[in-house]
Swiss-Prot record:
GO molecular function (one): methionine adenosyltransferase activity
Protein source organism: Burkholderia cenocepacia (strain ATCC BAA-245 / DSM 16553 / LMG 16656 / NCTC 13227 / J2315 / CF5610)
Ligand binding (Mg(2+)): 18
Involved pathway(s): Amino-acid biosynthesis; S-adenosyl-L-methionine biosynthesis; S-adenosyl-L-methionine from L-methionine: step 1/1
Binding site for K(+): 44
Protein name in UniProt: S-adenosylmethionine synthase
Amino acid sequence: MANDYLFTSESVSEGHPDKVADQISDAILDAILEQDKYSRVAAETLCNTGLVVLAGEITTTANIDYIQIARDTIKRIGYDNTDYGIDYKGCAVLVAYDKQSPDIAQGVDRAHDDNLDQGAGDQGLMFGYACDETPELMPLPIYLSHRLVERQASLRRDGRLQWLRPDAKSQVTVRYVDGKPDSIDTVVLSTQHAPDIELPALREAVIEEIIKPTLPADLIKGDIKFLVNPTGRFVIGGPQGDCGLTGRKIIVDTYGGAAPHGGGAFSGKDPSKVDRSAAYAGRYVAKNIVAAGLASRALIQVSYAIGVAEPTSVMVNTFGTGRVSDAVITKLVREHFDLRPKGIIKMLDLLRPIYEKTAAYGHFGREEPEFSWEATDKALALAEAAGVEPTARVA
């Protein structure tokens, strides 16, 4: 008997209040890294009706106009009208940054005898994941959820659906049979809108112009449940509807619940923070394992102690899909990937102003030129070392 189950993931648009906060935090990080790539940054943002608060710890030689960066980011997202509850020109921006604690800095900045022996900026555990459900090696529900809100933003920006507003959420439920995606069961999309659009017209346009063009044709089987703005009116949104905070969408940022999460958010953190850099490295490792054909699913866990460079643990789980044992793959990971914090920074070239782009529509599964952790350049070496035939993605 086939093992049949449903699995759901969600995403949110760039205009969701928590994502507004994430993007401001990462825009500030990028501006700092452009001037001083060795800065220590932990930039937190709160945004509410007409108000943005910037706080956290920053140690840098850069000279940054934080208020202007916050306003520019809000404008780019699309909050350019007082009717939206926050607009880039009229909102108040409060700045309350401190410097990084010297107690933390002493462990992060020590070089020891090895120039790659920088200690981790904190203790913690991080996960990376990849699977063969999509060409991007991502779980299908989160991949489709991202594409839906990305399309919502595209149609809003180019004016095809002029009544769309920046805030939106999506949710996709996929039916799996024997562990593989079989069909789309339910799609939820809630979008902020202008007050004068009638609900029936909105629902028809969202289904025909946003949802249907996004769904893979081979997974449309039978009747799909489309739930568009199921509560009806959604005029008040963005930071006016809910207070936004950096780091509150960590499952949206990663794998949509298909893999565990260590709990540490990404946005606003420079790459000395392993919450971010080691999660990126975990994705890089997992993606190369799957791309090499060593497994069809791979979960990586790494953990760190503050001030210590070497990971305290490295774990690989292929859920029984491995062509060699998990112990062999773990050994290969240790041989082919430098998972010390400074080794990760060097391996993935992370001291670049590349982070604002990550702060909406997922940090993983996007073929962006800056996203070095999405490369599969280690896959062939892994396949050869394991003695297996590489997949078509590598050959």
